[in-house]
Amino acid sequence: MKNITQLTAAALAICSFLAVTGCDEQKEISSAPDSSNAPAQATTAATTATMNKDDADKIAEIDIGAEKLENGVVKFLSSWDLNPAEGQPVAPALEMFQSQFGGRIEYVNTPWDSRYDKLAVLVQADDSPDMFSAGDMDVFPKGAISGMFDPLDDYVDFSSELWAPMSAVNEQFAFNGSHYVGAVDVEGDCVMFYNKNTIRDNSLDDPAELLAEGNWTWETFWDMMTKFCDVDAEKYATDGWWFESGFSLTTGVPYVGMSDGKIVQNLDNAMIEKAQNFMLNMNKNSLQFPKAQFNWQVQPRRLADGKTLFYPVGLYAMYPYNNYIQDFANNQEDVMFVPMPKCTDADEYYLPARVSGFSLIKGAKNPEGVAAYLNCAMATRDSEAAVEIGKRQAFDEYNWTQEQWDMYCLVNQMTAEHPVIEMYNAVSSNVADLVNNPMKEAYNSGASWTQTRETIRAAVQAELDTANKKLAEKN
């Protein structure tokens, strides 16, 4: 489990600096922060952060034929800044962008919940920023359909050797040969957090050890749940809002995805039905935390109390500033996690995935600068400096254990091998509403999936037909 490749280890370095989106965009709260007092457009002047000399020298050795940009300022519309906070190290991609291309990032601040509203206002006013994060997994196809983003192909050579490692992933964000996302890395989207004390106190097999043995599967997961759960003692197997989708994606089949250049729904797929039946049986056996009895409020603290066995959520929960890991155990070193269990009937170990990447905003004034930054991100993602910076931050700032670091890298390695990207949130709000809650009904309410899909299939297909037509009109 600890034989992690350098390429995979670099994922944490990238995630630490590029994928900060997880801090805001994946919260499990039911309401977003109030943004009514936000200014129409707050910007932070482009600055040049610095890196220590040893790391900077390593970045300088990476040669991609960089030439100084005529316009070095890239305006980044986001709720988070690519420039490091005071006292934090600069990301390898940003260091390369600054030192080799003479580039800088100008942060255009927007509240996360209204980022698309602000984007539309700026595009319509011919005041477009340049770059937008694709880490929320909702840029494509929605952003392409709405005309908020331009293809990157005139500026980024996706067929080049530099971009070869992400070729298959980037094709999932392409239509008729036009790429709307420059994905530079794949990350695990959902993992199973647990308290090692709870595992020990209940004489259960450690999931991390089961994974190392190649035996972390739906079946061993089921055995653990049935041994642990006790309704009278209020002991339940899973909590949170991430389980249903994350578990289903281990089948290798998303509810909505891309196939042969079209947006498709897979509601009738037999593998999805298997996942739904598994979750229905969880409900019938009272294994899942009954959120309905608690006003639909999740209870992450129960993990520390030994009352909940697993808390499935994004890897961003490992960062202390997100205020999750503190609820999982009284001591951080007792927190552990594993990927979602393998679907035994699947031909590979598929895992839910998200990407670190960016898109080119419609009417951007500096597309060349966006391309240069993306090339820097690709060139540095497996660099020695990226690995070392990521490790230092994980151990020195976040107080991770070696075991946690190794598992983080392993999850990202496994996800990169067989990623499954869910797109029902990326087509339209109607599609999201039609799929998101219904696909959770078997798990939460004991509803039959065969009946549920009958009530949504026609409406989902009609929405996808409309989306495909609009997408075709853009090309």
Feature-to-residue mapping (PLM):
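C-terminal capping/gating helix-and-loop segments adjacent to ligand/active sites or protein-protein/ligand interfaces
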Residues: 352, 387, 405-475
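Glycine-centered hinge/linker elements that transmit conformational signals in sensory
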Residues: 223-225, 261-293
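Conserved N-terminal structural module of periplasmic/extracytoplasmic solute-binding proteins
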Residues: 9, 23-141, 381-385, 399-402, ...
